[in-house]
């Protein structure tokens, strides 16, 4: 079926029906008996029934209120409810939350900034200043770069790999909520024991805001409003904050801002004011976080070795580290982007043919730079061109800073158990949706 330009709808070729976006969910909580109708529908979607059930009175579906997180996590949706719920996450609601809180914090991903910078033809540095200026003008106290939280995740990644027995490998990155949701619902027993327990940068940023900044400001976590602007909608699955935004939602606000306000001179130059100063933290290894590259760097720093990288296809990369004395391969890591490649990885793991030690897994082809919440373009050629520009801008971002260690030490003084907030756990999800729908 060719791309017709429709968005947020279900469209069937060669059929007169057209389903417009609506908030109705296909999963009812309660039902009541109604009279059976005799007309013959043009398109019929039904669960398989026994003969005894054929004439049983049907029941109405009661209106249900569900959260966006629940909607995105549900694998039974064949309506456009998910799209509409995403659209309901408006900045009007976000600004209302900011006004009603004692302290508001916004976390923004560098992928979002670079995507929007390409669209608006601005430098990431100037755009970061504009975004921070807009939110600070509307009452946000801190506008944070999610890359700062990613540094906490990176600092724990290699240690976690060392603690993972070779029989339990490969260790799979946990930064992509789309992949984690897929693992929990489809291959729980196989994948969940192998997924990294380190929280994603967005989740760690939430822990920093609610667990560190709140304590530092003398506030309860519930008094703090925390919103995130991320490269994909699936981030809502792991976001326990108050709101979620994406690149396209920021665009009009940034256009309205025009000129960024200067940062007050007395404000300290640190991780809480970096975006206001146009400082965005980059990372070696691409726009999906550079987890695989960080593992390789830490391994080589401790053990030495010869690093060799090969591109298997545009969404799969393999890196090996060879011993400088024996030439033996002592470490294997990979990057696997896109569900087609993810499914190939799962098949290899099922047959125990996957010998990799660590895999950076992302559900989207192209990784986070091509996330569903990034700026979208009409044609495939335009998308690929813009994606290359986003990746180029991301690669040019400055690397690292010295702020993480000082925050870690102060956080430890405020909460001796702070490290527990940097880890999570997963479990298989049992679905209640019938899998026997007949078209």
Curated annotation (Swiss-Prot):
<comment type="similarity">
    <text>Belongs to the NARF family.</text>
</comment>
<dbReference type="GO" id="GO:0051539">
    <property type="term" value="F:4 iron, 4 sulfur cluster binding"/>
</dbReference>
<comment type="function">
    <text>Component of the cytosolic iron-sulfur (Fe/S) protein assembly machinery. Required for maturation of extramitochondrial Fe/S proteins.</text>
</comment>
<keyword id="KW-0411">Iron-sulfur</keyword>
<dbReference type="GO" id="GO:0016226">
    <property type="term" value="P:iron-sulfur cluster assembly"/>
</dbReference>
<keyword id="KW-0479">Metal-binding</keyword>
<dbReference type="InterPro" id="IPR004108">
    <property type="entry name" value="Fe_hydrogenase_lsu_C"/>
</dbReference>
<feature type="binding site">
    <location>
        <position position="364"/>
    </location>
    <ligand>
        <name>[4Fe-4S] cluster 2</name>
    </ligand>
</feature>
<dbReference type="GO" id="GO:0046872">
    <property type="term" value="F:metal ion binding"/>
</dbReference>
<feature type="compositionally biased region" description="Basic and acidic residues">
    <location>
        <begin position="50"/>
        <end position="60"/>
    </location>
</feature>
<feature type="binding site">
    <location>
        <position position="74"/>
    </location>
    <ligand>
        <name>[4Fe-4S] cluster 1</name>
    </ligand>
</feature>
<dbReference type="GO" id="GO:0097361">
    <property type="term" value="C:cytosolic [4Fe-4S] assembly targeting complex"/>
</dbReference>
<protein>
    <recommendedName>
        <fullName>Probable cytosolic Fe-S cluster assembly factor oxy-4</fullName>
    </recommendedName>
</protein>
<feature type="binding site">
    <location>
        <position position="25"/>
    </location>
    <ligand>
        <name>[4Fe-4S] cluster 1</name>
    </ligand>
</feature>
<dbReference type="InterPro" id="IPR050340">
    <property type="entry name" value="Cytosolic_Fe-S_CAF"/>
</dbReference>
<keyword id="KW-0408">Iron</keyword>
<feature type="binding site">
    <location>
        <position position="176"/>
    </location>
    <ligand>
        <name>[4Fe-4S] cluster 2</name>
    </ligand>
</feature>
<dbReference type="Pfam" id="PF02906">
    <property type="entry name" value="Fe_hyd_lg_C"/>
</dbReference>
<feature type="binding site">
    <location>
        <position position="71"/>
    </location>
    <ligand>
        <name>[4Fe-4S] cluster 1</name>
    </ligand>
</feature>
<keyword id="KW-0004">4Fe-4S</keyword>
<feature type="binding site">
    <location>
        <position position="368"/>
    </location>
    <ligand>
        <name>[4Fe-4S] cluster 2</name>
    </ligand>
</feature>
<feature type="binding site">
    <location>
        <position position="77"/>
    </location>
    <ligand>
        <name>[4Fe-4S] cluster 1</name>
    </ligand>
</feature>
<dbReference type="InterPro" id="IPR009016">
    <property type="entry name" value="Fe_hydrogenase"/>
</dbReference>
<feature type="binding site">
    <location>
        <position position="232"/>
    </location>
    <ligand>
        <name>[4Fe-4S] cluster 2</name>
    </ligand>
</feature>
<feature type="region of interest" description="Disordered">
    <location>
        <begin position="38"/>
        <end position="60"/>
    </location>
</feature>
